[in-house]
Amino acid sequence: DLLLNSIMGMRGLKPTLAAIDSGKQIALANKETLVAGGEIVMQKVAEKGTTILPVDSEHSAIFQCLQGGVKPKKLLLTASGGPFFGKKRFELNKITPEEALKHPNWSMGKKITIDSSTLMNKGLELIEAVHLFSVAPENIEVIIHRESVIHSMVEYADGAVIAQLAKPDMRLCIQYALTYPNRLQSPVQGIDFLKIGSLTFAEPDEETFTLLPLARNAIKKGGNIPAAVNGANESAVSLFLEKKISYLDIFDLVAQAAENAVYIKKPSLDDILQTDKAAREFVRAKTR
């Protein structure tokens, strides 16, 4: 039996744990489950002998590139860069929700589209990858790839790099998780490489898009800090969409909430839930 968890946000954590307890294989589209409670979730997965199949395009790509069973040297997470690629912080001061919701390549929900624009989505995906693939955060590199054709890559010890390429269409990732290990006919058309012509790559601007390094530092510290970052971000994005805070306030409030969190090295599920709640309340209190 397979359960597809596509619940948005931290609300997906408890259903994921319940599904693991029931012994079900899980197709996971809810990245916050692993961001906030990754250690608890993956420990329970090991205990129950079940499997998590990633639905996110980047993690699905890595999962496919790892099918040879050889330990990777490095994971390379690709990012579109969002609608504000190339802009500096001072240019983001008056960004509206309507502008931030115009993603150049993907059609997604509002929250994940805002996260993509701030690069927090890539930060959350980095944390998710640490747990899913047992790779240290320093061995995960984020690369801006504007075309969103390469969905991620894996580098091995011999220098070989394996990449998964497809059109930016979530139907393919969802289908692969639901039909794994089989590959069935898909409604997604193949790539016409001659029309694409070239693929480009760039380094992310972490001085402007500070939530990416913040997320990386959160998983390096570990414990309940990723849960604080995630909870604060969910709250801040919601406030931005309600036009109660500015775009740059998202960056500042999440950083402040992470700094304010009381560190717990080995958090229980209750600790994770309380950390999430406290981070959300911190953000809300700052905006009253």
What feature does the model see in each segment?
Residues D1-R288:
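Catalytic, metal-anchored helix/loop core of enzyme active sites in primary metabolism
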